[in-house]
């Protein structure tokens, strides 16, 4: 009888822990977030002249551990001119919170907020699950907000 009680206790405890655990979003979801932010910045990623690349390819942990990172590049059509990095977006794997890495700009606008809420509902996260993001990406002191366009 004790063994049966212990089994049910263990099963209930592991189920509660599994529900409490926050899952991370998938790479493709983070890429979608970065594309939403790029459109907000009036950047059209067309995969010909303006491309989006992952910056997370060098190590398994990624460019910045805990975050997906994407660069948007205008590719040169001439060997005499270099490619131009237009933006570098960093997306939290937990909350889909998004920053531009070089400008230290935090994004918040209705379309992005809705997408973030939908993702957090799926992953079990909430907006407070990644409070150290500005510090982790090196933007703690110079952060600025990019609100929705009026």
How should each PLM-predicted stretch be described?
Residues 1-4:
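Positively charged n-region of N-terminal signal peptides that target proteins for export
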Residues 7-8, 98:
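A broad, structure-centric signal for solvent-exposed, well-ordered loop/edge residues
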Residues 28, 32, 36, 74-77, ...:
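Contiguous hydrophobic segments
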Residues 102-150:
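C-terminal partner/receptor-binding element of secreted or periplasmic proteins
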Residues 21-58, 122-130:
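Short, non-transmembrane alpha-helical segments in secretory-pathway proteins
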Residues 9-18:
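Hydrophobic h-region of N-terminal signal peptides that target proteins for export
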Residues 47-97:
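Exposed beta-strand-loop-beta-strand "reactive/processing" segments of non-cytosolic proteins
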